[in-house]
Amino acid sequence: MTEVDDGCGGRLRGSVLLEDECDLKQECETPTHSLVQGRDPPVVVVWRNVVLMSVLHTAAVYGLVLLPSASAYTLLAFCFVSSALGITAGAHRLWSHRSYKASLPLRIFLAVANSMGFQNDIYEWARDHRVHHKYSETDADPHNASRGFFFAHIGWLLVKKHPKVIENGQKLELSDLKNDRVVMFQRRFYKHSVVVMCFLIPAMLPWFLWAESLWVGYFVPVLLRYALVLNATWLVNSAAHMWGNQPYDVNINPRENRFVTFSAIGEGFHNYHHTFPYDYATSEFGCRLNLTTCFINLMCVLGLAKDCRRVPTELVMARVKRTGDGSHRSG
């Protein structure tokens, strides 16, 4: 079995996975052609979501207008990064892919940060993401990019899920999530945690610490920040499935997109990620333009994370030569 140093004080297993990891890997990597496409059912618009998203983005534009008068820029950045890490390091890399192990304090922090991000609870987010990987670009993909940019970006949230998304989501093995006390606690109290973490605390802190008006505090660190994090995440589903190069596998839609990488703190190395979904860094290049990987590495140094799973360089290069588009550049 090939082992390399993981940079987290342990040994990585390369592409060789333990039995329970093989089950998760299979859930994420079944070929998409195994799903037979049929006639699309009628699209049912969820008008409540249309109204809420319209109001949110209108309020975010107003937040931009108020931005010059705001004093809590540091808090705005902190809330953006914190809520983004709750998605990227938490719901995505830890709970969807189990690409590293986190201690209880770190899992609690990531669950709290995930509630600040307000993109469905961890259980639902991870379930839908596993379906996305297993049936990417098919009717069972929640944000199927073959239906166009708008649908992949935000449209999928404005209509009822395709029946195949629900059907195939119910078939997944999710016992690891069900057995995680932090995940299930957050799911049970999700609405309460969102009210506190996404809306109350980011609005109240500027008022309490910097005498910022509650009006500015609500529209800038709350609504503007929330809309920015949402769109950064959505760009991974839309732009990173449409524009960019494919140095690792030209046979799949996901691309390497630098703008998305910067916006989503490291999630834009998407061709690599869909080729090697169990790699904790989601990139061949470690911390480069990858704040999430830097955060996980720091947690390893502090003893709060371990067993980061990484793909050996020789396997990456073999895949580049076999299925890449020729655009790969080392280093």
Swiss-Prot record:
InterPro entries named in the record: Acyl-CoA_DS (IPR015876), FA_desaturase_dom (IPR005804), FADS-1_CS (IPR001522)
Domain of life assignment: Eukaryota
Subcellular location: Endoplasmic reticulum membrane
Residues on Cytoplasmic side: 1-46, 91-189, 236-331
Positions bound to substrate: 49, 120, 127-128, 161, 234
Residues binding Fe cation 1: 92, 97, 129, 133, 273
Keywords of the record: Endoplasmic reticulum, Fatty acid biosynthesis, Fatty acid metabolism, Iron, Lipid biosynthesis, Lipid metabolism, Membrane, Metal-binding, Oxidoreductase, Transmembrane, Transmembrane helix
Known catalytic reactions: octadecanoyl-CoA + 2 Fe(II)-[cytochrome b5] + O2 + 2 H(+) = (9Z)-octadecenoyl-CoA + 2 Fe(III)-[cytochrome b5] + 2 H2O
Cofactor field: Fe(2+)
Tissue note: Expression is highest in liver, followed by brain and intestine, and lowest in spleen. Also expressed in heart, gill and muscle.
Motif (Histidine box-3): 270-274
Record carries keyword Iron: yes
Cofactor note: Expected to bind 2 Fe(2+) ions per subunit.
Motif Histidine box-2 boundaries: 129-133
Lumenal side: 68-71, 210-213
Catalytic activity, EC: 1.14.19.1
Regions that span the bilayer: 47-67, 72-90, 190-209, 214-235
Pfam family, one: FA_desaturase
GO biological process: monounsaturated fatty acid biosynthetic process; response to fatty acid; unsaturated fatty acid biosynthetic process
Similarity comment text for this entry: Belongs to the fatty acid desaturase type 1 family.
PANTHER family tied to this protein: ACYL-COA DESATURASE, STEAROYL-COA DESATURASE
Role, per record: Stearoyl-CoA desaturase that utilizes O(2) and electrons from reduced cytochrome b5 to introduce the first double bond into saturated fatty acyl-CoA substrates. Catalyzes the insertion of a cis double bond at the delta-9 position into fatty acyl-CoA substrates including palmitoyl-CoA and stearoyl-CoA. Contributes to the biosynthesis of membrane phospholipids, cholesterol esters and triglycerides.
Listed name of the protein: Acyl-CoA desaturase 1
Native organism: Tachysurus fulvidraco (Yellow catfish)
